[in-house]
UniProtKB/Swiss-Prot annotation:
Entry GO CC: cytoplasm
Top-level taxonomy: Bacteria, Bacillati, Bacillota, Bacilli, Lactobacillales
Subunit structure: Homodimer.
Active site (UniProt): 113, 255, 285
Top EC class of this enzyme: transferase
Coiled coil region boundaries: none
Function: Catalyzes the condensation reaction of fatty acid synthesis by the addition to an acyl acceptor of two carbons from malonyl-ACP. Catalyzes the first condensation reaction which initiates fatty acid synthesis and may therefore play a role in governing the total rate of fatty acid production. Possesses both acetoacetyl-ACP synthase and acetyl transacylase activities. Its substrate specificity determines the biosynthesis of branched-chain and/or straight-chain of fatty acids.
Protein name per UniProt: Beta-ketoacyl-[acyl-carrier-protein] synthase III 2
The protein's Enzyme Commission number: 2.3.1.180
Residues covered by region (ACP-binding): 256-260
Length: 328
């Protein structure tokens, strides 16, 4: 299926504080070499004064500036995040207010690290010809990290990225070509974060009240096995729907979870090195923000051109996976 899906602008926003692997060695028993060998990560950005909302607002403002559109031209704002500042109001309505997009409907989605590519599907389904959306992934995962647990603390970073997308008819480039999405809820317990304690005057439960269940808990081997099996399958199914081969794709914009996972996916699909851009070394795993941050850098560095075919793939908590095939 080919429908219009034109990306008019891309942007990213990062906290000013950068934390290196060497700095983490002061908090836990680890080393720079240990982290690099197992994850490919050298540093990550950590929010101090920034919030999930402020990072998302920065991205939205950049998108409007690049596209030269007024905020009142925006019809839809979706923020993908698993680390909102509040349960309510959600992040997207705060972005709407900050930029003055009074006509836009605005809501958040939480599909963890797969959130951005699920947001792409929602934008594709929602937009009518002539309408425009802001799709933003924004995370401050540092609030969900136990900074003494080296199995998870070394992985995550904070940041935001986004796209301004329009369903502009009669264009020769900018199309949605296909997609694939799947959820494996029975395996959801292999990756958890943010457990809320059940506390009220009538409850005898203490779920998470006296523990660190709010922090990331992950069965690394199970998540790795899931990703290296289901991500290639999702990409293959999305390409099949788009009636394309992997050789037709300029770049695979994968969630930057772990360099070993990304490389394994590339090997299973027989992809060329230049088809698998990576920036995890600089930012770590920024969950729903990772694909739009990577894509914004690719555009800025002129690594993609109009008419290029791309695959965006996200995977993670849920457990969930999704792939979107587009023409830029």
């Amino acid at each position: 299926m080919t429908t219009n899906f034109s990306i008019l602008a891309s942007a990213k926003a990062l906290p000013t504080t950068k934390v290196t692997n060497q700095e983490l060695t002061q908090l836990m028993a680890t080393s720079d070499d240990w982290i690099k060998q197992r994850t490919g990560i050298r540093s990550r950005h950590v929010a101090t004064d920034e919030t999930t909302t402020s990072l998302a607002v920065s991205v939205a403002q950049q998108l409007l500036q690049q596209s030269r559109l007024a905020a009142t031209a925006i019809d839809l704002i979706i923020v993908a995040t698993m680390s909102p500042d509040y349960l309510t109001p959600a992040t997207a309505p705060q972005v709407q207010a900050a930029i003055g997009a009074e006509k836009a409907i605005a809501f958040d989605i939480n599909v963890a690290c797969a959130g951005f590519v699920y947001g792409m599907q929602l934008v594709h389904q929602y937009l009518q010809p002539g309408q425009t959306a802001l799709l933003i992934g924004s995370e401050t995962l540092s609030r969900l990290v136990d900074w003494h647990d080296r199995s998870t603390a070394v992985l995550f970073g904070d940041g935001a990225g986004g796209l301004l997308i329009t369903a502009k008819p009669n264009t020769t480039t900018g199309h949605w070509l296909g997609g694939h999405y799947a959820t494996f809820g029975a395996d959801g317990h292999y990756l958890t974060a943010g457990q809320q304690p059940q506390v009220n005057p009538w409850s005898t439960r203490t779920d998470g009240a006296d523990s660190n269940r709010w922090a990331f808990q992950m069965n690394g081997r199970r998540v790795y096995d899931f990703a290296t099996k289901q991500v290639p399958h999702s990409i293959e199914q999305a390409l099949m729907q788009a009636r394309l081969e992997s050789s037709d794709i300029k770049a695979f914009v994968l969630h930057q979870a772990n360099a070993r996972i990304v490389k394994s996916v590339g090997q299973k699909l027989n992809l060329a090195t230049e088809q698998l851009p990576m920036n995890i070394a600089q930012y770590g795993n920024t969950a729903a923000a990772s694909e739009p941050i990577l894509f914004a850098e690719m555009v800025a560095q002129k690594q993609v051109q109009r008419g290029d075919k791309l695959v965006f793939t996200g995977f993670g908590g849920g457990l969930s996976v999704g792939s979107a095939v587009i023409e830029y």
